[in-house]
């Protein structure tokens, strides 16, 4: 008899099991939804790509020189000719020359008499004869240098191609053999009406057998001058500076500065000196009989400018640009420095490194001529628009409204926002300034939204209620306008404080290449000198927003600010900070970041609001109405001979500029600073709070230790009266001349006929038959 089978019947699932499985199911669904959100919102977001630009690599043809019975440059072949210039080359040496038909001057890429140099040793002699130097890493991350003469031309490892209005040299540097590291680099010359365009398109660079080019120095001795020449080099040091030829400062370091400052992701955390960045992508060489303006047209964000004098490496005074093609980063493997390895970016930055050498005629002499030519070019390109004349210059002042401070509730610490200046009090400041005779005023309102001065990321706009809310903000704007001024609201897009709990630092922050960690910065710790400190306040530390997500934040802000009745937007960082993102899966170079930034400046301009930039770089000029914290001096470098208002000579009459905060100028220096404002043609600029500045002593803004409006009102009005007394006659006028005279006297000339003499000495001085009082100025032609 067969045994019967019993069927087991499952009982009902226990309540506990059902709850656990339900929780797990919800968790899986939530996790899946979040992953979808994460990938859509962060990984696949690519709006920044809409702003990226590209370039084309021109196909080469057979090089054919232009026949010429009597060459203007002996032993050279004619390549191209324009209305003003002739382009020549010497195929045996790859030297290029530009002959100026207007004055008969010839400018060479390399000195023809290099062998006669009295200073250059073997390596420097090689450099004198080279069109560029390249710096590279090998497969073991050991760096080296190659120069075109010894590593290419001398070996006859180069060829020539014809291109439109020019010539392309193809250099093969190194040992061209199996398994030997070598490089192929194109160098292009194109002639235009009054300038030569020189470029190295990185798409044409080839690297063989584990060689990695990380920097190229281009045409180190183009237009270089000798001991016999008189003149100077113009460099974009702060406001601008000059280095006199043969100035004898042979122990001083050469001038070398990154354009738009070094990429924060390539900079050292340790800050040993604080320098004003180079805001202009240009330099110049000014001789008695000719002047050459050099502008970096493409790749400026990855470039630096170097200048030096004769008697150090060779007999020449020189200036040249260098371009960074990639960086190497430290990767710490096991927690201590002994395990550090160099990680090299695999691909060079895709950029058409382009430099324009403009040969100026007698109309554009000296550094004033360089500035005038460049300004006229920007006007012609639609990047600068002439301002209308006004009765007075504007008075600039920042108003700190909301500030974060630590508070406690039931033993828990948190940040809350308190008012240093609410919107009604800011109205009172504007009214009192107007009553003091300051009708033309520009208010920069800081800390008005999203939690105060160190506000949360700007994808939302929450106007702080305790300050007065939206209605109070618009009433404040109405008051400033009625007083004859403009009000700008301040916003930081790229520097996001660590106090913002809603920002996804891991996904949206810019990252380093080596270890891949998020870049974080802060203030300088006076003990360690590292620039990553909060000095006790988390708000002082910040992450840098990746350029990938900049369009999202700017777009959302632009949509919201357009609905608020304020005159302008003050950009705390967008016009002056340029950062890459070295995230390995989606790397964005500084040059690509520049494309994105320009696109966002256009978006903000389209809101119809005026734009203010903070010490704006030259790429922001086309969008900027006003500039605060404009450079009014150069960095005190030993090789520098004098500071000049190069920045202001380009912008004055087209963009209104203001100085840095005058609250923090030493009282003994204030008289000289006031004269400095008059010389450079910039307005005074203060920072105010209605409450006493001591209220901020236990906040992240304790460095603003003297801002109380009631203490500064009379002093500010007096300073404004002094500066306005001179500059009100040149509002809307272009600065066309600047002369450094004897005995600490400066002469500034404007295109409306006004001339201002400034005397920095403590005795009255004579200039052009006029007497200028001690520590004062004199107006002529008003």
Regions from the PLM with identified roles:
Residues 95, 104, 176, 204-206, ...:
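Solvent-exposed loop/turn segments at secondary-structure junctions
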Residues 22-35:
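Hydrophobic membrane-insertion alpha-helices, especially the h-region
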Residues 87, 92-101, 287-319, 496, ...:
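Active-site-proximal substrate-binding groove within the catalytic cores of carbohydrate-active enzymes
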Residues 390-478, 482-549, 576-580:
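Aromatic-lined carbohydrate-binding/catalytic grooves of carbohydrate-active enzymes
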Residues 1-16:
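N-terminal Lys/Arg-rich, disordered targeting/topogenic segments
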Residues 371-381, 422-425, 429-432, 545-569:
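An active-site-proximal structural segment forming one wall of the substrate-binding cleft
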Residues 218, 443-445, 489, 571-573, ...:
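Conserved beta-strand positions
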Residues 36-387, 769:
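N-terminal accessory beta-strand-rich subdomains and adjacent acidic, glycine-rich linkers
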